[in-house]
């Protein structure tokens, strides 16, 4: 985990690298990374402090039960757990998002 205060771009870079590693550990390929990157880009622009003005969704994955201030690794881990449990993969989650406007 990075030390000290990071600027917004460094946080986004760190979050993306962390997510790529988690996907790699799960044996998922670059297609899944591209889908995840697109999905969370649409949801939060990879901003770990993103707040949805219309709901309680927060953070990179825009989860409803994500507390403000949740560390980036925990946001990524919880987001990937949600995607895996609900959709099976980032590509399926992105497809749902493209069809419905949410995931």
Walk through the language-model features, giving the residues of each.
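Peptidoglycan cell-wall recognition and remodeling modules
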Residues: 4-103
């Amino acid at each position: 985990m990075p030390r000290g205060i990071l600027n917004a771009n460094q946080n986004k870079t760190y979050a993306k690298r962390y997510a790529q590693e988690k996907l790699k550990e799960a044996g998922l390929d670059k297609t899944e990374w591209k889908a995840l990157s697109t999905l969370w880009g649409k949801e939060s622009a990879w901003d770990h402090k993103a707040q949805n003005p219309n709901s309680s969704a927060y953070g990179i994955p825009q989860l409803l039960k994500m507390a403000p201030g949740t560390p980036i690794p925990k946001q990524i881990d919880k987001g990937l757990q949600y995607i895996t449990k609900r959709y099976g993969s980032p590509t399926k989650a992105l497809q749902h998002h493209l069809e419905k406007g949410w995931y």
